Amino acid sequence: MPNFWILENRRSYTSDTCMSRIVKEYKVILKTLASDDPIANPYRGIIESLNPIDETDLSKWEAIISGPSDTPYENHQFRILIEVPSSYPMNPPKISFMQNNILHCNVKSATGEICLNILKPEEWTPVWDLLHCVHAVWRLLREPVCDSPLDVDIGNIIRCGDMSAYQGIVKYFLAERERINNH
């Protein structure tokens, strides 16, 4: 269990508002994700983990999400990197997939960059928290937005309605990813 007193009194990288907010969120994340109760943990089977990479620095986080059922991402897990700016919660965190980890119309595969409206400064509201942001990324896997693609080719396939081609390409990509990672 992290020493929250030390975290709350650490001011090296961020503002008091940011540190106070992120420590509160961390406590909620630990409690929520530890619960087996589906009401207390609506993210069960969605967000497998959400933790700071280093418990002494709450500016960098890592999440593991499960691919949504009935999508080509089903039965796969994806690592998400989260950078919390010192201006959080007034500005959004920067969230990206691990490089070359996923093929999706709203993700630039080479960098992991995600195109998601709530993560844009002009759309962001401090009401959102890290759990909700990670859940929104998971929902993007379920419901791609082909009108704002970072991968234009995948976006065009979806826009044309060729879902079997989309699913086939993604499944092939993920099978290759798994094959490479197992060697």
UniProtKB/Swiss-Prot annotation:
Belongs to the ubiquitin-conjugating enzyme family. Its EC number is 2.3.2.23. The active site is at residue 115. It is found in: Peroxisome. One of its GO terms (biological process) is protein ubiquitination. It is an enzyme of class 2 (transferase). Pathway: Protein modification; protein ubiquitination. It comes from Saccharomyces cerevisiae (strain ATCC 204508 / S288c). Residues 17-179 form the UBC core domain. It catalyses: S-ubiquitinyl-[E1 ubiquitin-activating enzyme]-L-cysteine + [E2 ubiquitin-conjugating enzyme]-L-cysteine = [E1 ubiquitin-activating enzyme]-L-cysteine + S-ubiquitinyl-[E2 ubiquitin-conjugating enzyme]-L-cysteine. CDD domains: UBCc_ScPEX4-like. Coiled coil: none annotated. GO terms for molecular function: ATP binding; ubiquitin conjugating enzyme activity; ubiquitin-protein transferase activity. Keywords: ATP-binding, Nucleotide-binding, Peroxisome, Peroxisome biogenesis, Transferase, Ubl conjugation pathway. The gene is PEX4. GO terms for cellular component: nucleus; peroxisome. It comes from the Eukaryota. This is Ubiquitin-conjugating enzyme E2-21 kDa. Gene3D superfamilies: Ubiquitin Conjugating Enzyme (3.10.110.10). Catalyzes the covalent attachment of ubiquitin to other proteins. Essential for peroxisome biogenesis. Required for UBC4-independent ubiquitination of PEX5.
